[in-house]
UniProtKB/Swiss-Prot annotation:
Alphabetized PANTHER family for the sequence: 50S RIBOSOMAL PROTEIN L28 (PTHR39080), LARGE RIBOSOMAL SUBUNIT PROTEIN BL28A (PTHR39080:SF1)
Name the record gives this protein: Large ribosomal subunit protein bL28
Positions of region (Disordered): 1-24
Molecular function as annotated in GO: structural constituent of ribosome
Family: Belongs to the bacterial ribosomal protein bL28 family.
GO biological process terms, semicolon-separated: translation
Composition-biased stretches (Polar residues): 11-24
Length: 62
């Protein structure tokens, strides 16, 4: 699986950069994902978790 939050499913979103002349070029807004060790089915596993999920206590580190 790609870089996506294991808990909430948050991932990068896309949009456009706009110049003063309103020309557009594609860009990405990356989610604040951190690689952490958590318990998955009783075993420690390294997964990508969003900083928001870590701060809100939805997941606990091992």
């Amino acid at each position: 699986m790609g870089k996506q939050c294991f808990v909430t499913g948050r991932k990068a979103s896309t949009g456009n950069n706009r110049s003063h002349a309103l020309n557009s070029s594609k860009r990405r807004w990356n989610a604040n994902l951190q690689k952490v060790r958590i318990l998955v089915d009783g075993k420690p596993k390294k997964v990508w978790v969003s900083a928001r999920a870590l701060k809100s206590g939805k997941v606990t580190r091992v």
